[in-house]
Amino acid sequence: MSKIIGIDLGTTNSCVAVLDGGQVKIIENAEGARTTPSIVAYMDDGETLVGAPAKRQAVTNPKNTLYAVKRLIGRKFDEKAVQKDIDLMPYSIVKADNGDAWVEVRGKKLAPPQVSAEVLRKMKKTAEDYLGEEVTEAVITVPAYFNDSQRQATKDAGRIAGLEVKRIINEPTAAALAFGLDKTEKGDRKIVVYDLGGGTFDVSIIEIADVDGEMQFEVLSTNGDTFLGGEDFDQRIIDYIISEFKKEQGVDLSKDVLALQRLKEAAEKAKIELSSSQQTEINLPYITADASGPKHLNLKITRAKLEALVEELIERTIEPCRVAIKDAGVKVSDIDDVILVGGMTRMPKVQDKVKEFFGREPRKDVNPDEAVAAGAAIQGSVLSGERKDVLLLDVTPLSLGIETLGGVMTKMIQKNTTIPTRYSQTFSTADDNQPAVTIKVFQGEREIAAGNKGLGEFNLEGIPPAPRGLPQIEVTFDIDANGILHVSAKDKGTGKENKITIKANSGLSEDEIQRMVKDAEANAEEDHRLAELAQARNQADALVHATRKSLTEYGEKLEAAEKESIEAAIKDLEDILKTGDKAEIDAKVEALSTASQKLGEKMYADMQAQQQAQQQQAADNAKPVDDNVVDADFKEVKRDQ
């Protein structure tokens, strides 16, 4: 049975792991790194770069290099958070026909799941290279506070990448799995997972219990902010650099796309350096130019300055912690361990804030970049039956309900309910002889439905005429283990029923997903074609070089016509190298090989002659120098003493 891999699809970086021989293995990518930047670049020759190669060229290709796309996944274009990102991102965020936030690259509109699928494809390939077999199934992690549309969109991304997503699992829960199975501490423990990543923040309170030899992970509560993460910290530094440069040089860099990309790189580097040193210097020569000539940027930033810039962002993570503790029905003093996940938790100020709130030192023995992927791989092994000693009880992060008379949100399933779960409630009509009802489904905590996230709607028709309040309509909410919602409505009188799987009132249709899957497959074929073309060019290049070298050494031994025919074949091959396809290059390589046959014969004959000459010389050296050797007589003369 093939392995189910675990993928942490992050805003900034992604990671892939697998359970191999009972141990979790974090798999290195083709570049030798254990994490891969979640960056996709679309080149002008049609090639798609993913990961470190995409990141390296971002400065020169900012409009077609997509990063932090996870912040857009499953979101509407008109949402406040998306509108804020439009001004910050160098690439173009556009409104899709269904109202979703999409991106536009080189004149083509792409859905965020399509872009995320490119990253997932690289993760899939990384795992396949390591395992030496095809991988078709995965567990993918999402922020615990992701709503239904965002979870559905992540699942779609997996499908587009050619993966069957066996389970969508919450990031903090995955980290708890990795932590819990690795530890020797016995007995029940309550832990907090504080997960501050590149684009999202989550906090979960989880109880780990040993039930008859089985490790049980029960999520007691979860909370968070899906638009708060390392990208926001970077932005604070960028804004500061821009304002300082404007004060000094009078030039506004915020409108210069190329400069902004360099600033982003520098800000991220400075942020990382300031976690281990007290001061860093940002040095960007030729950042811009005006009438007086080129301008250079040189700026020192201290750790204290960075902390002042981002203090409010760190403070924003504490309120969700407070709510999560309250919802879990525990006290801060009941917490046994605090686990830090996500690259941003390496920042000393973040660690101090967490320690201050929870009153204990966070654990340092969990790798914040790899724990989530490791947990996903463990869940994969549970689903494949490889491990049978783990039970995971996750929760739905937000309340789910329907809109009832007066626009009120009637909650069917409360937040932090353990999933999978099912709940039914009976409703009635609001008017006499009402022939149909519209069931509008919402997710969120507000009392008025319009203040929450609309997930979808459907009609139940054919209700027989009756006074208001008489028909009985049973509405059932069913959440599966992925946290994805299925809703049905049934008229108890007639038995008529209608149901939907919530796909958001937008999201990708089945046709769109299928088209994107085909696109992705075509892309894979195109990548293969480009790789073959590159190989053909390299081989042709090597042949031209070798033939030229031989021609210089042995050319005078050829007849003029033979030499001319080889030189013409070399020129033909060189002409086709840059523009030709593989078949054309192969044909010219064949022609050059045929033309240089005579040259090969001359080289071979010459080498044979040289070898014979060397053998002859060796034989001569082995003979005595003179055959006329004369034996000499000698006589011993004894002298008198």
Curated annotation (Swiss-Prot):
Segments of skewed composition (Low complexity): 608-619
Compositionally biased region (Basic and acidic residues): 632-641
Keyword annotations: ATP-binding, Chaperone, Nucleotide-binding, Phosphoprotein, Stress response
GO terms assigned for molecular function: ATP binding; ATP-dependent protein folding chaperone; unfolded protein binding
Induction / repression: By stress conditions e.g. heat shock.
Function: Acts as a chaperone.
Record protein name field: Chaperone protein DnaK
Gene: dnaK
